[in-house]
């Protein structure tokens, strides 16, 4: 399912707030990460990514030349990362081998992984249906500090109370269902 106009507008505003945090982005080539929760149906994930990239590119010159780290969140034990051109993501070629995986996931492990391996990214987008859980609230809050929480934008279909409690720093945009 594609993002609506209101969600795209909120996303652009969230991106602007993240990039204008003092000390975050100072110009030049932007390095960003896009986490795709593989519990999303392939068609929905592809449409959402294409819509997001189109909106970002039309929004600002900053997104014309980007180092895009794509993180495929398949399960707690399987988090794959690859660097892909935004044009390839916009065309949808990385989704040719996409497999939907419905498993119980904990955001704790994803946040730990992002803190370790995506610390250089100035913007992190998480696309998910929001069906993940929080195993350890303390670990999540620790992973979000000092910078990760200020760089994350969560694009979710639904938000549970435990996920909402994490949003002290990370911004959440609920998609139309």
How would you name each of these model-derived features?
Residues 23, 59-61, 115, 143-144:
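Beta-strand elements of modular eukaryotic interaction domains
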Residues 1-127, 131-135, 150, 154-162, ...:
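Von Willebrand factor
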Residues 19, 138-139:
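Alpha-helical scaffolding within the catalytic cores
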Residues 117, 141-177:
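Von Willebrand factor type A / integrin I
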Residues 45-47, 135-138:
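Conserved ATPase-coupling elements of RecA-like P-loop NTPase cores
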Residues 52-59, 139-148:
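Catalytic-core regions built around general acid/base machinery
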């Amino acid at each position: 399912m594609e993002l609506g106009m209101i969600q795209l507008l909120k996303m652009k505003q969230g991106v602007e707030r993240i990039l204008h945090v003092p000390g975050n982005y100072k110009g030049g080539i932007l390095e960003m990460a896009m986490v795709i929760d593989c519990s999303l149906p392939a068609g929905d994930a592809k449409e959402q990514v294409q819509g997001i990239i189109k909106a970002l590119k039309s929004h600002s010159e900053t997104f014309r030349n980007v180092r895009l780290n794509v993180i495929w969140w398949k399960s707690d034990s399987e988090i794959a990362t690859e660097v892909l051109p935004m044009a390839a993501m916009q065309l949808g070629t990385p989704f040719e081998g996409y497999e939907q995986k419905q498993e119980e996931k904990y955001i704790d492990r994803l946040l730990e992984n992002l803190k370790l391996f995506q610390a250089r990214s100035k913007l992190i987008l998480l696309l998910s249906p929001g069906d993940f859980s929080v195993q350890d609230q303390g670990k999540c809050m620790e992973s979000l500090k000092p910078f990760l929480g200020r760089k994350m934008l969560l694009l979710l279909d639904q938000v549970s109370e435990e996920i909402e409690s994490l949003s002290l720093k990370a911004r959440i945009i609920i998609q139309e269902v």
